[in-house]
Structures are given as structure tokens and as C-alpha cells.
Amino acid sequence: MSIYFFEKINAAGIRTHFVSADLGDTTMEVLPAKVFGHGLEVICRHKAVGSFIRRYGEYIEEGADLPSYVETTFKNDEKGDPLVTKDALVALGVMTEAQYDDIKDMTQKITKIVADDLKEKGLVLYDIKFEYGYDPEGRVMLIDEIASGNMRVYQDGQYIDPMTLSKLFFA
């Protein structure tokens, strides 16, 4: 799934670390990239579910539409992947304002690519998680993977687990 989406995203002119892959050798060639801070996760939400509803459930109904809502968290399992704002990321020296703006823009564009592709298969993307890094010039790029385990997808109102999603996607 990662290779499929990285190729689509690259074709759309969005920077990623993906260069090529050989499924036979199970290898992937990628550009060098540094992670932001000690690792950052960027989530784009189309529906109010998961940790979003746990945090804000008194203000919004579960499953309510969200307009490509983007949020960032530090990768830190011990602290429950705490939310972090743009201002905090800049103040802490994790990234520049321009890098944050690039990440948000790229996240919304990539999410649309993935959501549109899933929609063609009768599937609805509720949310998806990405990781970003930057090259030696400081340019933001999508890194890591785009896998079924990084997205929450539904079909006919029912959640599709990652293994089933992979099978449905390539059916």
C-alpha cells in the first residue's frame, strides 16, 4: 500500500522520501531525511473519532464531519503522544512556521489523494496519520509509510480493521 500511495503522491508533485521499491527483494530506496524533534505524528481527520472524540466529545458528536482537521503530536508512548501546537513547535525549535505550514498543506493534499482513492473502492477515510522529515536544505517531505494500520477506514458505517483493509484495497 505504501508503494502505491508514494507513487501517486510523488506523481502529484508532493515531496516524499520515496525513490523506488523492489517488491521481489522487499527493498525500498529512500532519500535521506531527518525527523522533526524526536519524532512527530501528523493526523488528518475527516470524522470525529478516536482520541479526538475522547478529548472533545462534550463539544461534538462521534462521527461528525471535520473539514480536513490537522493536528500534531509528539511521538512519545510514555506520555500518550501529547498534542503540540504550531506555536509550541516553533518556540521549541522543532520546526519553522514555514515548515509547519508546508506540513499542514501537504497533509491535507495527501489525505485527499488517499480518501479519493479509497472512495473509488466504496471505502470512507475517517482519519490518517503521517510522519514527516526534512532534507539537508530544510524542505519538508513525507517519510515512513502509508499503511492500513495508519488510517481508520469504514465501509457502510462499519470499521474495517487494517488486515481486512489491505485485502479489500488490493482485491
Segments predicted by a language model, with ranges:
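Active-site loop/lid in soluble adenylation, ligation, and acyl-transfer enzymes
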Residues: 1-74
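Conserved metal-phosphate-binding beta-hairpin within the catalytic cores
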Residues: 44, 125-145
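ATP-dependent carboxylate/phosphate-activation module, predominantly the ATP-grasp catalytic core
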Residues: 55-102
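Short polybasic/polar patches that bind polyanions
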Residues: 10, 90, 119
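A long amphipathic alpha-helix within ATP-dependent nucleotide-binding catalytic cores
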Residues: 95-126
